[in-house]
UniProtKB/Swiss-Prot annotation:
EC annotation from Swiss-Prot or TrEMBL: 3.6.1.54
Top enzyme category: hydrolase
Statement: the UniProt record of this protein carries the keyword Cytoplasm: no
Protein name: UDP-2,3-diacylglucosamine hydrolase
Residues binding substrate, per UniProt: N79, R80, D122, S160, N164, K167, H195
Keywords, ordered alphabetically: Cell inner membrane, Cell membrane, Hydrolase, Lipid A biosynthesis, Lipid biosynthesis, Lipid metabolism, Manganese, Membrane, Metal-binding
UniProt subcellular location: Cell inner membrane
Species of origin: Chromohalobacter salexigens (strain ATCC BAA-138 / DSM 3043 / CIP 106854 / NCIMB 13768 / 1H11)
Binding site for Mn(2+) 2: D41, N79, H114, H195
Keyword Cell inner membrane among UniProt keywords: yes
Length: 246
């Protein structure tokens, strides 16, 4: 049994090589997997299931082919694609996950997260996150005309980029105390997340027992990241190359 976990592709029309690499990944690697977890920020922006451009349609169709072929698909919202809804999930053949979420990988129960909720030192972002995950706020946004939502998404991305250039690196990384607290709350020794774009395996001690935090990397032209779990083997973080094509 093979399980794959990926995040932070940030798919958009300006990076067609990454989109092509992802579509190839679905046909090549994921087709041989039993389960694929998409842990957020698969899309750079998502303004609602009622707006589908060519890129979005391509991805949905590829995911549907994968799910129809027998691979179980799970989708967790990120800080960029938090408006992905049930219509997307139904079209893609995926199941939407809560964040955080417990999952059994091999013989081990692990905690899955996108990772943005762990960055509690970034108080400005945490305020935005609380607002953006509010169902009432989301309903108000989804009620806006598509053109207005496109402009809002563009504005939010620019604001985020400008703000991040002025923040210290430590603020945008996870808060260790928050990591320990949520792992303790869910009774796990392994946490897998993305968001920070800092791929690594962090080994530490939690309440006297060995623990680990596996951080997925973001995809870039020609390079991707995954966590792969084969049968009962422990999760393995892996960087891989793909052919970048326009």
């Amino acid at each position: 049994m093979t399980t794959l976990l990926i995040s932070d592709l940030h798919l958009h029309t300006g990076q067609p090589d990454i989109t092509r690499g992802f579509l190839d990944y679905l046909e090549r690697d994921a087709r041989h997997a039993d389960t694929l977890y998409l842990l957020g920020d698969i899309f750079e922006a998502w303004i609602g299931d009622d707006y589908l451009g060519d890129l979005e349609r391509q991805v949905i169709e590829a995911l549907r082919r994968l799910s129809d072929a027998g691979t179980q698909l799970y989708f967790m919202h990120g800080n960029r694609d938090f408006l992905v809804g049930e219509d997307f999930a139904a079209a893609a053949g995926a199941t939407l996950l809560d964040d955080p979420c417990l999952a059994t990988l091999g013989r081990q129960t692990v905690l899955l997260m996108h990772g943005d909720s762990l960055c509690t030192g970034d108080e400005e972002y945490m305020k935005f996150r609380a607002m953006a995950r509010d169902p009432e706020w989301q309903a108000q946004i989804l009620a806006l005309p598509i053109e207005q939502r496109l402009e809002l998404a563009k504005s939010l991305r620019m604001q985020s980029s400008d703000a991040n250039t002025q923040k210290a690196d430590a603020i945008m990384d996870v808060t260790p105390a928050e990591v320990e607290a949520i792992m303790r709350e869910h009774g796990v020794s392994t946490l897998i997340h993305g968001h920070t774009h800092r791929p690594a395996v962090h080994e530490f001690t939690l309440d006297g027992q060995p623990a680990q935090r596996i951080v997925l990397g973001d995809w870039r032209p020609g390079r991707g990241w995954e966590v792969r779990v084969e049968d009962d083997a422990p999760p393995r973080l892996r960087e891989f190359a793909f052919q970048a094509r326009a």
